[in-house]
């Protein structure tokens, strides 16, 4: 009996020793795992931590919690399994997630289930409101970026089908889409109609039938963006225009006829922008110029209440970027005039490399954004946790040192985020491969809807590259600064009687050229002053100024209404001669200066005067006359 008792005590002692050994071994292993995990998280010294309400923050905390819980489960073995605070399935999933051994479908399902678990009422529509509280506005922007990149990781770039992933989940894929993209028409699994815009051929007046799809409408709608992209075909021009833009678009069609354009146009509308009379005028001009023009009415794919409340002015451009049916397109403002064919843009090496080509605005160093805007945008960057869990990376971010001289894109990033310069991109013409850049376009739209960010930029311009940046995409920016075309004037002679060698052009147009000094396109039309009734308004505003220079209203009106006479182009060096805004054309006129150096400057950002051959001038001014013809 005594021997048996001693034997039991010895066994118990050995068991306790074994358990203690296992305990300390686990602690050492767990510590090493935590150090490794910490090193992975902190590979960027200044990388931010996810906000408290982030799904990735919750998952990381859950991993730490389950590691401790696993130890208790091991120690209690079979005796106290009810102490565990998580299911065996979740523990396995979290361990696989930490070791990057998990299937993407399981990872994505878990991420979005956590999103709903943290906040059952989450909705990206919240970002469209301006709360004027940095903590609230910045947190919502941070969550927006994280959610959109997660959606892209799983369903756009990741090519998973949400209707399949969430087939046996607490997450409803239709509800997920409704909350992720609040501008889309609200759908559910009972939807009987495929989401598709109403498209009308404006030359025939006939409706273009929606394509036949090889799936149930609820499945198509529940994975709308992937299916929409899959059915996008061909190339074309895309516009969004209001009533006031119709006369400009009619001129644009005539220029396209002169240039022998063969690509179709799609005017993308939320449904109420154009009157019956304007539609009739466009149809008539399209027939006369033999241009194919289609009206894309998006009222069938947009949420009416959201669109009426939040989509206006510049936001309409994002509807056009997303809901045209082209695979590749050139987005145009109605007052843009191209001087090269569409193939030039689509064949551009920088466009082919990145899938989106942007052009630089005038360099206006004295106009700036705000530091609080930069602080907000830094919160949109991927957190350390997001980087670890789904591998999000940006071309540029605030945690990494870089040189602004490495590329035009780096220079723009540096000047916006470090120097706070406001104007960088002229979005009058943007070349886009929608199949490649859809996630960045969606990011752009949602950023431009953000109630706070709207106060940080002018319209949609900078959002084109910011959206691609925060979606983790690359993008291309033409390296030549926005410039000016028009009649070339020479500064008066110096006091010693010698020519000044300084030339200037004053006009309302922004011109864009390439590194070979070729004129590509102009924003602002080709009328000397495009602003209606500007002569009368100018005289009424500053009668002494305009009377001393032009005599009377009728003379100024004749000048304003004339075709722009193009003699040359100036790309100014603003560090020497900044842009000068003058009072003409309702303050829309600018002057730029350069020396007549005979194209000797090799640096693209140096100020220079560009003159054209007789053949080039004839072609340019023929287009100007075509634009201004009645």
Range-by-range predicted roles:
Residues 1-7:
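N-terminal Lys/Arg-rich, disordered targeting/topogenic segments
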